[in-house]
A protein has these predicted regions:
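Extended C-terminal subregions enriched in glycine
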Residues: 78-105
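Extracellular/periplasmic helix-loop-helix junctions in multi-pass membrane proteins
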Residues: 101-105, 126-141
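Hydrophobic cores of alpha-helical transmembrane segments in multi-pass inner/ER membrane proteins
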Residues: 1-13, 86-92, 144-160
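Long, contiguous internal "core" modules enriched in hydrophobic/ aromatic residues
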Residues: 1-81
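Membrane-interface transmembrane-helix boundary segments in multi-pass integral membrane proteins
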Residues: 61-85, 132-157
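Hydrophobic, well-ordered secondary-structure elements that form the walls
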Residues: 45, 92, 123, 165
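Central hydrophobic cores of alpha-helical transmembrane segments
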Residues: 107-117
Length: 182
């Protein structure tokens, strides 16, 4: 999933900035950027294909999914739906298009944060219109839950990273991975 690659990129860049992963070079980052770019495009394909499948198969009982998000509940979800497509497809596509952008740390960080935010909105859009309807919206509870779970995730992962070596020293392909070149 593209969010996983976004989190991996952020973790690697953070550890590299702290000097714990000095062996990660621009070629490694380029490959991770390619994965983020590819899975972002794949997400867009699957999302649009869902719409096309409902439209071309003439499944009126399924159109409620899109109708509820575009026209229903006083159109409170329409802005989020548009923002979701921009954050998950358009901006990562534009940011990660060039080879140099996939090798530049700030562009990778920007794209990773955009993708994570976009996928939060994606999951929100899947659940909230059908569950709470017109009473939905972004408030303290939504941002609080993201903060709590992100903090717990960072706490657990940072605790686990202190317990093990970040390099598998006896792995047979380690020399090849350290000298990764594109």
């Amino acid at each position: 999933h593209v969010t996983t690659y976004a989190v991996i990129v952020l973790a690697i860049l953070y550890l590299n900035d702290k000097g714990l992963m000095g062996y990660v070079n621009d070629n490694h980052l380029h490959d991770l950027g390619k994965f983020m770019f590819a899975f972002s495009i794949f997400w867009s394909y699957v999302w649009f294909e869902q719409f096309l499948l409902i439209y071309y198969a003439n499944l009126p009982e399924e159109t409620i999914y899109f109708l509820e998000r575009w026209e229903g509940h006083n159109k409170i979800y329409k802005t989020s739906e548009i923002l979701m497509v921009i954050l998950n497809f358009l901006l990562p596509f534009l940011v990660l298009m060039t080879r140099d952008a996939k090798r530049t740390r700030i562009f990778l960080k920007i794209a990773a944060f955009l993708i994570i935010a976009g996928h939060y909105i994606d999951f929100y859009q899947m659940i909230m219109p059908g569950v709470v309807g017109k009473h939905g919206g972004y408030g303290l509870v939504e941002f609080g839950m993201v903060t709590v779970f992100a903090s717990a995730f960072i706490y657990v992962i940072s605790g686990e990273l202190t317990k093990a070596s970040l390099v598998a020293k006896n792995h047979p392909f380690l020399p090849e991975a350290l000298h990764h070149d594109i």
